[in-house]
């Protein structure tokens, strides 16, 4: 197919999809959705051989797409000079957590992976699609095996149970990166409020579910937190992530 024809057809398709009206979930009318179709096409992971090698190892053990995994990878790779450990809450089968462990190059850094291993918990009135128990098709053994395959078993610590209620005392009190992938309002809020005073300056918080239909509870929680806490820079990425960067301690 000729280049001009490809461009013409692409433009027509994009134009049609973008012309569709925005929409919202019936249970969360203030969180609006639309066809997010940026024209940008740069795919930096294509030339990142180190990332692609890791991606091929972990991709079958995660529900996170390559765009979000690459963002986690690049963020983690920039934190070698930031003191603190990594924490992921909402692990599923360990793919994204082990990717973080492989990305982090700081000597002595631990990666804590917390999950109930029984599926989503704390679904409530703020949530639109989740009722509890979803994504329960996992197990501790699957995560431990993934850590062995990735050769990060010495750095990874798996925490079983509801976080922070059942296992937070096992996590260090200084965190450089927090990845929250829990799908619902209350669980995301509880994790963030527990972690906030433990985040060092320069730490990064990534919310996996912020931009997705069906996860409006997480969207609402993040928006509320940002308006109430001035010590963070907030980025809404069109890949679905929300990213917070801690720039000041409480009260500064």
For each predicted feature, which ranges?
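S-adenosylmethionine/decaboxylated-SAM
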Residues: 38-63, 73, 82-252
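Membrane-proximal basic amphipathic "stem/tether" segments
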Residues: 1-57, 247
């Amino acid at each position: 197919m000729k280049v001009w024809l490809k461009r013409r057809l692409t433009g027509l398709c994009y134009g049609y999809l973008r012309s569709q009206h925005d929409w919202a979930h019936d249970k969360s009318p203030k969180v609006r959705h639309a066809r997010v179709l940026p024209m940008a096409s740069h795919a930096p992971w294509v030339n990142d051989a180190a990332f692609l090698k890791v991606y091929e190892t972990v991709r079958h053990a995660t529900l996170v797409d390559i765009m979000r995994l690459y963002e986690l990878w690049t963020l983690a790779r920039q934190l070698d000079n930031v003191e603190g450990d990594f924490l992921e809450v909402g692990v599923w089968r360990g793919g994204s957590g082990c990717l973080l462990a492989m990305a982090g190059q700081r000597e002595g850094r631990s990666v804590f992976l917390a999950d109930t291993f029984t599926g989503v918990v704390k679904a409530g009135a703020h949530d639109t699609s989740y009722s509890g128990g979803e994504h329960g098709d996992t197990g501790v053994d699957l995560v431990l095996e993934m850590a062995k395959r990735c050769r990060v078993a010495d750095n990874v610590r798996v925490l079983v149970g509801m976080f922070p209620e059942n296992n937070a005392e096992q996590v260090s009190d200084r965190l450089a990166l927090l990845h929250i992938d829990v799908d619902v309002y209350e669980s995301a809020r509880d994790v963030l409020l527990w972690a906030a005073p433990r985040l060092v300056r320069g730490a990064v918080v990534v919310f996996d579910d912020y931009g997705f239909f069906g996860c409006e509870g997480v969207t609402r929680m993040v928006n509320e937190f940002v308006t109430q806490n001035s010590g963070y820079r907030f980025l809404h990425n069109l890949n679905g992530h929300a990213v917070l960067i801690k720039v000041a301690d409480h009260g500064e």
